[in-house]
């Protein structure tokens, strides 16, 4: 069988000095007028004619076509598939597309039979000259076209979907004509097109016919964790990624080595170039593992930027074996679509991985106090580098034996960063821009012995001067100060200086990166811990991880204050030390510099003084809504019930500021997806836009077997036509093992899916979204 599209692509890639491999089960005949391949036989098809049936190349309409002349005999062309190809078609579906016109008669039959069954549409011109279709095993005819349109060229499509009740849908010029067509019994084993009857004459001209089997393998198990993006500037260029798992395990096991691999297609996912290892150049001695490739396609530069995590080879996120002092981090590589070149990996760990001492005053208070010998008759200065994560009562205090100065930091209801100063009634708004509210800031107190006042500076900018309050205390303290008010703060530095001498110095940024041999316990370092109720404190973060799936480039931020169109952003998994959460990592300059947003707001409840009941969002994906909001869907690992509320295996969150902060969408969890697997697994979400500008969301996840039960089987596809409020479907895409998946728009009609299937083999599905959509919208009418 000649794979015409494969050969064309191979020739093009050879011109660029690139290798290619033929994966796609795509069988076609194309009447190009090429003298070398001008007949079906020369393109690999078997002639199956009887009596006077024949075929000939014609240019009668000014374009080449193969004229099927079933006059006085059958005139059809066939190709027989292998057992493996039949099995693949049964498990992953197939699509048959024909561009032809019927000139006279009937019994024009373009179909596929797998040895046990077939779906057989019969195209004819009826006695009134109308173009009609009927289906084997079903009654009635459907008129497709009348008048002169009946004998013009049209597109006929059959789309077969697998499942417990497999069926096909028939489309005419892109419109759904018949759904849920059940196969009929047949012993034939072939793809067939032409006039299929020796007793009924029929003449048709074929410009093109394609038969495509879904589910070609592009990465083989034990490799895992697929992701995929497609270029919108250079149509047809698709880049796929996975973890190369030599040894077969998750990262962080001595028994295996993990790297990041990629393959590229330049014909929409039909053929793929050879596998390329992106990380072996920075992993020559196999001392690290790399995981979770997260690509972002940037249309402004026509590049793909893929981020991935680095781990020590003996510890990673799973099992919380990774520790803050271990060499976890994030790297990225850039692929230039036009040239086909990859840049060397770039390390951005210092930009995105936080090193700090973290205090969560959730249900209690936790302060650290250090007695000092400040002299109120001399100037002094304190510096603190702090990030306010949430809540209030987050405090810095300096007392010099005469007066004390207290700065209490909080996030107010509007999301702004606010300071309250002791002895001053009015709060001070320090920052209202969300991107800066949740960042680390330098808080400096400068005491004037002459005036007995202190001036507050934030990031070097003078904010105010105040007198504080009379106090005989002589100390410095920080933490969450009120057991009745929740708050979380992260500290990187505390320094107290007088007369050029550091009286107190706490370098949490440094200590968070040190091994246990270095003393880090604040109480052993001279601090007094003052704790009430339930709190949590730790050095972190242990790890940051891009997670599986693709990231996005923002394009709909016109309605958002501080428009950030062009922002590259993805949801990353962060492990503080004990719990997983998700935060956005983003770049506003094409990837040169990266910042982090806040973590997802999650409910919690202390079950005891040492057991915190909360959610742990992990693998997540996001999509930009039409109004500029970002919708994030996250897998919930481990616990799913907090304070009696079942949040299910999946929860959605919303951002109204370009991914900086998030809100939990009540009751918007896995339950909005009917017949979804109850197991935890990575999913995928994306936006799809048609050529007419209409748009909707797509979501893929296993359904389970049967649907709605626990298990990684039977990948489903859901549609949302109201920006993620409700979801229609699922449409089953895979029959059998289905784990992680990623879906991305390929063109104005199709999306491409990569999914883990049997034995972790990662397969490609090229799905006709505009056709499948009609299966749902038709049922609503």
UniProtKB/Swiss-Prot annotation:
It catalyses: Hydrolysis of alpha-(2->3)-, alpha-(2->6)-, alpha-(2->8)- glycosidic linkages of terminal sialic acid residues in oligosaccharides, glycoproteins, glycolipids, colominic acid and synthetic substrates. It is an enzyme of class 3 (hydrolase). Substrate binds at residues 224, 635, 712. GO terms for cellular component: cytoplasm; extracellular region; intracellular membrane-bounded organelle; membrane. CDD domains: Sialidase_non-viral. PANTHER family: EXO-ALPHA-SIALIDASE, SIALIDASE. It is found in: Secreted. Pfam families: BNR_2, Sial-lect-inser. Cleaves the terminal sialic acid (N-acetyl neuraminic acid) from carbohydrate chains in glycoproteins providing free sialic acid which can be used as carbon and energy sources. Sialidases have been suggested to be pathogenic factors in microbial infections. Facilitates cholera toxin binding to host intestinal epithelial cells by converting cell surface polysialogangliosides to GM1 monogangliosides. Its cofactor is Ca(2+). It comes from the Bacteria. Residues 1-24 form the signal peptide. It comes from Vibrio cholerae serotype O1 (strain ATCC 39315 / El Tor Inaba N16961). InterPro entries: ConA-like_dom_sf, Sialidase, Sialidase_fam, Sialidase_sf, VCNA_lectin-like_dom. BNR repeats lie at residues 263-274, 585-596, 653-664, 718-729. This is Sialidase. Belongs to the glycosyl hydrolase 33 family. Its EC number is 3.2.1.18. Monomer. Keywords: Calcium, Glycosidase, Hydrolase, Repeat, Secreted, Signal.
């Amino acid at each position: 069988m000649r794979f015409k599209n494969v050969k064309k692509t191979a020739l093009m890639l050879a011109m660029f000095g690139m290798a290619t491999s033929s994966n796609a089960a795509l069988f076609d005949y194309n009447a190009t007028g090429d003298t070398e391949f001008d007949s079906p036989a020369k393109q690999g098809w078997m002639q199956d004619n009887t009596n006077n049936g024949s075929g000939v190349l014609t240019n009668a309409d000014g374009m080449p076509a193969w004229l099927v002349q079933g006059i006085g005999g059958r005139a059809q062309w066939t190709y027989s598939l292998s057992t493996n190809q039949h099995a693949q078609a049964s498990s992953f579906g197939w699509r048959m597309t024909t561009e032809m016109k019927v000139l006279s008669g009937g019994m024009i039959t373009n179909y596929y039979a797998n040895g046990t069954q077939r779906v057989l549409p019969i195209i004819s011109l009826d006695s009134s000259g109308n173009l009609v279709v009927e289906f084997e095993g079903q009654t009635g005819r459907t008129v497709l076209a009348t008048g002169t349109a009946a004998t013009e060229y049209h597109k006929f499509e059959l789309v077969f979907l697998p499942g417990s009740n497999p069926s096909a849908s028939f489309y005419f010029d892109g419109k759904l004509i018949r759904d849920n067509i059940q196969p009929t019994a047949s012993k034939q084993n072939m793809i067939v097109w032409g006039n299929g009857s020796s007793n009924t004459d029929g003449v048709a001209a074929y410009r093109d016919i394609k038969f495509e089997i879904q589910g070609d393998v592009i990465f083989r198990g034990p490799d895992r964790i697929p992701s995929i993006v497609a270029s919108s500037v250079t149509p047809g260029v698709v880049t796929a990624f996975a973890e190369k798992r030599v040894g077969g395990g998750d990262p962080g096991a001595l028994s295996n080595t993990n790297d990041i691999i990629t393959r590229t297609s330049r014909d929409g996912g039909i053929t793929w170039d050879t596998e390329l290892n992106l990380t072996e150049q920075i992993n020559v001695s196999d001392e690290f593992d790399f995981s979770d490739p997260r690509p972002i396609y940037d249309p402004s530069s026509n590049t793909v930027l893929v981020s991935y995590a680095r781990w020590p080879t003996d510890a990673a996120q799973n099992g919380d074996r990774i520790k803050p002092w271990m060499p976890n981090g994030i790297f990225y590589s850039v692929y230039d679509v036009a040239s086909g070149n990859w840049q060397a990996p770039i390390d951005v760990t210092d930009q995105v991985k936080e090193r700090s001492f973290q205090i969560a005053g959730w249900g209690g208070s936790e302060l650290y106090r250090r007695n000092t010998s400040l002299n109120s008759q001399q100037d002094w200065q304190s510096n603190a580098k702090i990030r306010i994560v949430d809540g209030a009562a987050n405090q810095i205090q300096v007392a010099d034996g005469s007066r004390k100065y207290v700065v209490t930091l909080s996030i107010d209801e509007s999301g702004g960063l606010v300071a309250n100063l002791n002895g001053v009634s009015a709060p001070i708004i320090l920052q209202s821009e969300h991107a800066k509210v949740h960042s680390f800031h330098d808080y400096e107190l400068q005491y004037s012995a002459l005036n007995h006042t202190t001036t507050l500076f934030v990031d070097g900018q003078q904010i105010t001067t105040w007198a504080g309050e009379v106090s005989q205390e002589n100390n410095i303290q920080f933490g969450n100060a009120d057991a009745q008010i929740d708050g979380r703060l992260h500290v990187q530095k505390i320094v107290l200086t007088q007369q050029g001498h550091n009286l107190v110095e706490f370098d949490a940024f440094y200590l968070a990166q040190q091994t246990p041999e270095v003393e880090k316990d604040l109480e052993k370092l001279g601090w007094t811990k003052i704790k009430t109720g339930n709190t949590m404190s730790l050095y972190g973060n242990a790890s940051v991880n891009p997670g599986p799936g693709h990231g996005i480039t923002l394009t709909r931020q016109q309605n958002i204050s501080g428009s950030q169109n062009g922002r590259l952003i993805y949801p990353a998994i962060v492990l503080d030390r004990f719990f997983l959460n998700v935060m956005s990592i983003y770049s506003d300059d094409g990837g040169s510099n990266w910042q982090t947003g806040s973590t997802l707001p999650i409910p919690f409840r202390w079950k005891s003084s040492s057991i915190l009941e909360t959610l742990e969002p992990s693998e997540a994906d996001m999509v930009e809504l039409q109004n500029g909001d970002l919708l994030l869907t996250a897998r919930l690992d481990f616990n799913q019930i907090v304070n009696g509320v079942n949040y299910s295996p999946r929860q959605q969150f919303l951002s109204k500021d370009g991914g900086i902060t998030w809100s939990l969408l009540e009751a918007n969890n896995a339950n909005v997806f009917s017949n979804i697997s109850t197991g935890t697994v990575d999913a995928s979400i994306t936006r799809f836009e048609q050529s007419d500008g209409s748009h909707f969301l797509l979501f893929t996840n296993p359904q389970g077997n049967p649907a709605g039960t626990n298990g990684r089987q039977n990948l489903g596809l859901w549609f949302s036509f109201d920006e993620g409020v409700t979801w229609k479907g699922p449409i089953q895409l895979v029959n059998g093992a289905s784990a992680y998946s990623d879906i991305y728009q390929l063109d104005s009609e199709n999306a491409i899916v990569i999914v883990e299937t049997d034995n972790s083999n990662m397969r490609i599905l090229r799905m006709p979204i505009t056709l499948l959509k009609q299966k749902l919208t038709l049922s609503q009418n």
